[in-house]
Amino acid sequence: LLLMLLFVAEVTSANTVDFDKAFKESARIEKQIKRTSFPKRTFLITDFGAKTDDEANPCHEAINQAILQCSLSGGGTVIVPKGTFYTGPITLKSNVNFHLEEGAVLKFSTDQSLYFPAVLTRWEGIDCYNAHPLIYAYGESNIAITGKGIIDGQGSMETWWPMCGAVKYGWKEGMVAQR
């Protein structure tokens, strides 16, 4: 019994968090964070061809073009106006404030083919090539997502759960499985 109690005590102490060290690390990280700043230029996604309420034609190409042009011009704000915009993956670029006006809704497509080819991303803390996240940036800086609009990933048992690779959630042979 004594041996077992010593073992439990040792295991418990091995799992103890050093809060002082953790807080010092968080303070170091906070010092590296810089406030974003954007030029006054604006880019309206509808000027690049994005249309509302058109589920059959997701407008991610128009949105990504607006973001790219904004970044290439030195930065500014890409505006998603009021309305429902169906979209695929969005890639943010440096010096872009992606702003959703009040009443704006971005509904991401559940068509998994839109999220390929794979991009370098992280899955459970591991760098890997995987499906393009709904909103993505790699190697970019000075980015913000602002506004009172809604970002709707349309996650449901029917749409995203089959990707876990379990038959009980609807996965079938040939489908993408993230496990």
Regions flagged by a language model, labelled:
Residues 5-79, 84-97, 101-179:
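Extracellular "leader-to-stem" segments immediately downstream of a signal peptide or signal-anchor
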